């Protein structure tokens, strides 16, 4: 950094602004790189004395108000800096002048220019150019407003962070407790928090009483985490003695010293990182840009060629400029901007019905071109509720039902041991169902209590009936709640069973701790001594369930003998007067947050669609790997390096990493990797799980995938996911459990939090890309029959065959509904069985599409139009050869005696009525040939007969364009308004043969493509 400072200091005053900007940019990049690094702090390692010395805080009395005021003046308020927001007017201007709109604006300006030139040089200039300019401007403004309305979402990332900032904080200053505004909390303050509070800043805990915090928005762990003064982990995000700004304290109380405030907190760093990241251009925006380059190239090439040609043909400079402008404007597809916007909007609406809410229209297509999905685990791939998965009793493992609708397997519930186990699980449990939920299915009911206990409660309620009744029957006398030192929970109950002693002691906790307190074990309802063999059996079961990524709890009980503990005995939990050893071990119950039902199928679909699914989670590697196997992210038979090492019984470092298709990467390993090593992992492993990752690492993984050229979708729900969501090509947030911040950073929100909805989105995205190609091919084709009349008018000097107003009637009238109807077309083949498109080679509009639309189908259409034009003029006495070179006298308003081929004389007014009738007929001919074009654009490879005519909107479009053409031709008063005149019915049929020719020509072309895949015809004409 010294270099930058030095330069600014010693350079002369005339330093260029460019240099300054460059410096700012470099500094921003350095800052961003700094934020991407892991959190480095050592406050969690300091002893209380060192903490006191570092912050100068009295650990019981806190800071003095004067010292706090000094620090506040030095550090500024404890608040997040809002990012620079884009003003709404700038966003509106982007919609008005971005991409496609620019092309139309240039067209409009050229029209006004041409009108200006004509007004200055002619006495009575025609108003066509003026109309065209006004219409083009109107089209841009209307579609711009429409797009702006669709995307009227501002960058509210920071506003949602603001909602996370607690308003009040309880601090101790000079020994007095006071509630102050959270913004006034300073580094070194002594702060007290209790259950229900938000943590006001990053705190180093110095004393705690049963304190648990919910870190899920930060680390993605769904279980509340215990907080205590003990230093338990090198990693500050994992140690118990740091509580983070804006996480929630769920139970207990704690005191801590503030170590970071505002932007310097861990959450503040994530916020700054998320708002500072630049999301790149969406793939569809790049495609539209590419398309504009193509069209502009064609327009300018034609314009300049004919400009030179008209000078060679001895037109004046002014006329040549008017022609140049006319040709460029005629090449602009006026209706296409509206068509693309409407097609994307329709798809967005369709996706919303399928639970995918798209915030940004262009993101609709991005999902279709996705090649890698980085998915969060908790709540996206899994159900986000702990569920009992297995039990071990009677020396065997039993499987519980983890399906969402309880349609899975059941186990033997007749064993006496199961009765004892379910009794302990129901009684030694503080979770309760919330009130008034009797009508809801058990699994859907809300529970007050921690995740593991509510899983047990629901399991017992499903298997054994009402737990409330069981608890009333066995009333509780005393209890010792779970704590982190003894790692068990114990309660003593009255036993109503006459055949057993009067008191029942039940205990649950960490399996190894519970086993240590037992001397016997219950097998098939009979108590037996716990020998080594049974201990081994326990150990194997414990390892097996733990290896499945499940959380295992052990359960034991003891029937307290009546002679020692008669009825009314006073149990004392402080000075324990009852046995807590030599108990009877009953069994294990293991829990997992199980996969959602639809996920394995969705992952399979992604795989067949060529999309790589990577799991990125903050959870433990074992759990992550188990879920990855459960949902098919690691498919059957694919091994990780560890699996291969275990199978061959060799150390892990002797296995060649390339032999393993699957790979589980721990966050701590990722921390020390270079970007080249990460690239290697992403390149050579097809199935990857990243576990125990931090927010910054999620971002690094996304950037790694993008370096490989992948188009990356990221799913996430926590604040921790927001930088990755913002950086990804498409960020997908969760609608139900997602934090506001993640929803703001994302481009799309899954309303049902289900990974399977993403697959629906991919399908819709691929379909709209295919259908947009069809819409564009359809729209561009009519450009040729619109341009050629003008070109022939210049070269052959004939009366103008088609006027500007009629061109507008096609582009903004008859072609609109049919072009949009193609968005409703069904897929030709299974789009989910092909690889993602390659953004470099598979373009929305390529040279082949242009050559088909302009060079082939468009030419046939133009022939149809000219045929009609010559037929009408011939019927009125002007034979084709007589027309050559007649233009100057024809357009001269003072000449009233132009002779036709039969010697009849025509006044100026009469000639113009015939000319405008020709314009109308040419327009109707284009509508007739566009019928065939619409039908052939339904498919790109299949025959139309295979595809069928199921698209009702398209059939409506055919009728609509015909009805509109008839209305414009026959409506009284159109002659004065749009200069369109009624046609003889026979003139409608002139273009029919050409329409049929287009249909036959294209069916033959597609037949050859299907018969000879990869052949010359496919290479040249398949778009």
Swiss-Prot record:
Its EC number is 7.2.2.13. The modification N6-succinyllysine is found at residue 661. Keywords: Acetylation, ATP-binding, Cell membrane, Cell projection, Ion transport, Magnesium, Membrane, Metal-binding, Nucleotide-binding, Phosphoprotein, Potassium, Potassium transport, Sodium, Sodium transport, Sodium/potassium transport, Translocase, Transmembrane, Transmembrane helix, Transport. Signal peptide: none annotated. It is found in: Cell membrane; Basolateral cell membrane; Cell membrane, Sarcolemma; Cell projection, Axon. The modification Phosphoserine is found at residues 16, 40, 47, 228, 452, 484, 668, 675, 943. Phosphorylation on Tyr-10 modulates pumping activity. Phosphorylation of Ser-943 by PKA modulates the response of ATP1A1 to PKC. Dephosphorylation by protein phosphatase 2A (PP2A) following increases in intracellular sodium, leading to increase catalytic activity. The chain crosses the membrane at residues 97-117, 130-150, 292-312, 320-340, 776-798, 802-824, 850-872, 916-936, 953-973, 980-1000. One of its GO terms (cellular component) is sperm flagellum. The active site is at 376 (4-aspartylphosphate intermediate). Residues 118-129, 313-319, 799-801, 873-915, 974-979 are extracellular. The modification Phosphotyrosine is found at residues 10, 260, 542. Residues 1-11, 28-39 have a biased composition (Basic and acidic residues). The modification N6-acetyllysine is found at residues 9, 21. It catalyses: K(+)(out) + Na(+)(in) + ATP + H2O = K(+)(in) + Na(+)(out) + ADP + phosphate + H(+). Its main location: membrane. This is the catalytic component of the active enzyme, which catalyzes the hydrolysis of ATP coupled with the exchange of sodium and potassium ions across the plasma membrane. This action creates the electrochemical gradient of sodium and potassium ions, providing the energy for active transport of various nutrients. Could also be part of an osmosensory signaling pathway that senses body-fluid sodium levels and controls salt intake behavior as well as voluntary water intake to regulate sodium homeostasis. The sodium/potassium-transporting ATPase is composed of a catalytic alpha subunit, an auxiliary non-catalytic beta subunit and an additional regulatory subunit. Interacts with regulatory subunit FXYD1. Interacts with regulatory subunit FXYD3. Interacts with SIK1. Interacts with SLC35G1 and STIM1. Interacts with CLN3; this interaction regulates the sodium/potassium-transporting ATPase complex localization at the plasma membrane. This is Sodium/potassium-transporting ATPase subunit alpha-1. It comes from Mus musculus. The gene is Atp1a1.
